[in-house]
Regions:
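Conserved beta-strand/loop subsegment of P-loop NTPase cores
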Residues: 91-94
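N-terminal glycine-rich anion-binding loops that anchor highly charged ligand groups
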Residues: 40-54
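Helical "lid/coupling" subdomains associated with nucleotide-phosphate turnover
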Residues: 6, 16-19, 36, 58-89, ...
């Protein structure tokens, strides 16, 4: 999935820096090349793309990054390196999250990225990940009078979910090891394949695991003080696309859409009890999310039920945008 509109690199506007941000998670790797003005908070997107690489394949079970997962990731990095060169980004920052934090052979991953992109991936903590996500998601929301404070930003990734509460800045943050890939591999896989569809026993075990993770998050983050829930990442945006019955994935219609808790519950129940073929037939469904979207939707629903949120505000701006702002600020 990519978004790029230029046959050649446009000039950098005065007061802006051209930066590239790469976010490598458990399920996907993403690139943003943008012109950023840290003084005004403006971000002019030049290229934004995502590739499903499933870097975290079997990490929860083996503790290692699989050779085929590394090669998929390096192939995407080679594609991104070409785009970064073509657009002339002055600064590049590569942030790696849950899967590479957990892997015993992450040095192999680091060496490969350095060889291809010339920058060393920062294997950041869950708390750092949460701060970047909050910055990216709330930059545009802070001037909105229709959204009450504080925000609770939830970034539902492949291996972990970040919770951040704050108004203008982060007040409290926590990362927990619950994500769409990790929950799928831990609870919905039997004999090397995702159960099609999952059993009620599997679903109940996954729900209990998610609830325990929410208990952990609440030890640090006052979840129930939130007045606006903001949801990030592919599980949330895919649920939005299903709720809107989009004929294809449409970032503009998804960004800042609002989904009611009842609608999220309806979609989650359908995803949990549907077959692979039924999920794959959804027009807006990325092929790489077909097997893991049910777990991601259940994480979102569980959060909404825990805090009593009537709706979730969906944001396409997330950790990538937060990284880009930090790069431009020289942080």
């Amino acid at each position: 999935m990519r978004s790029s509109f230029f046959a050649y690199a446009p000039l950098v506007p005065e007061g802006f820096s051209r930066v590239a941000a790469v976010d490598c998670g458990t399920n996907s790797i993403r690139l943003l090349v943008a012109d950023v003005n840290p003084a005004t908070g403006e971000l002019l997107e030049l290229d934004r793309r995502m590739t499903i690489v499933r870097l975290g394949q079997d990490v929860d079970r083996t503790g290692r990054l699989a050779p085929e997962a590394l090669e998929r990731t390096f192939a995407a990095c080679r594609d991104y390196a070409e785009t970064i060169r073509e657009l002339g980004a002055e600064k590049v920052r590569f942030v790696a999250t849950s899967a590479s934090r957990d892997a015993s052979n992450r040095d192999e991953f680091v060496r490969g990225v350095v060889d291809i992109l010339g920058v060393e991936p920062e294997v950041i903590s869950g708390d750092q990940e949460a701060e970047f996500s909050f910055t990216g998601a709330t930059k545009e929301l802070k001037g909105r009078d229709d959204l009450a404070r504080p925000f609770l930003v939830v970034d539902i990734g492949g291996g972990s979910t970040e919770f951040v509460v704050g108004e203008e800045h982060v007040r409290a943050a926590r990362s927990v090891d619950v994500g769409c890939v990790r929950m799928t591999e831990r609870h919905l896989v039997r004999d090397g394949a995702v159960t099609d569809p999952p059993t009620e026993e599997q679903i109940a075990a996954m729900r209990a695991d998610i609830e325990r993770a929410l208990d952990l998050a609440e030890e640090t983050v006052p979840l129930c003080e939130a007045r606006t829930l903001v949801g990030l990442a592919g599980s949330v945006t895919t649920v939005s696309s299903i709720a809107q019955e989009l004929p294809e994935y449409d970032s503009e219609r998804i960004h800042h859409s609002r989904i009611s808790r009842d609608k999220v519950r309806e979609i989650t129940e359908w995803l949990l009890h549907s077959t692979h073929a039924e999920r794959a037939a959804v027009p807006s469904m990325h092929p790489g999310r077909v097997d893991v979207i049910a777990a991601g939707a259940l994480v979102l629903l569980s959060i909404m039920e825990r805090i009593g949120a009537e709706e979730v505000v969906v944001s396409e701006h997330d950790i990538l945008d937060g990284i880009a702002f930090k790069v431009a600020e020289g942080v």
